[in-house]
Amino acid sequence: MENKVIVGAYVETAMQAAALFCDVAKMAGEQEGFYVLPLDGGGKVLAEPIIVSLGYREGVAAVDQKEVFKAAFKVGADAIIVAHNHPSGVLKPSKADLHLTEELKSRAEWLGLEFIDHIILASTDSAKGFDFVSLAEGVL
């Protein structure tokens, strides 16, 4: 699954959202990266996915939650989809992934942002690109 981000396009499915993160996840290489896709209230893409962090801290993605929301507000987002890649190729979310998702969802709601999804990407076959799991569809 690969796709170029088209600002102004609409995101209606988890597969469309995951496709928009592929290029930025490739840039992370063997590092775990965390990204935010800012949307308007109707699901229109306002900007390309924004890299919020790269690397690990204590074995999990090094995510400063303030940076997630700062990136969203900087472009006037009403909604966000977040994603991160698992360089290991394992799609299963960790307990830390699930905990972070719940924290982001709660804080987004408090800030008046719609938290749509958290996508995990994993490269399982270089010719294919990335597989993904949607936490909104599968876990939340």
Where are these regions (language model features)?
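N-terminal beta-strand/alpha-helix entry module and adjacent surface
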Residues: 1-77, 93-115, 122-140
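Short, solvent-exposed loop/turn segments at secondary-structure junctions
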Residues: 88-92
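Residues embedded in well-ordered beta-strands within globular domains across many folds
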Residues: 81, 119-120
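Short beta-strands and strand-loop turn motifs
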Residues: 80-86
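Conserved beta-strand edge residues that scaffold enzyme active sites
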Residues: 86, 120-122
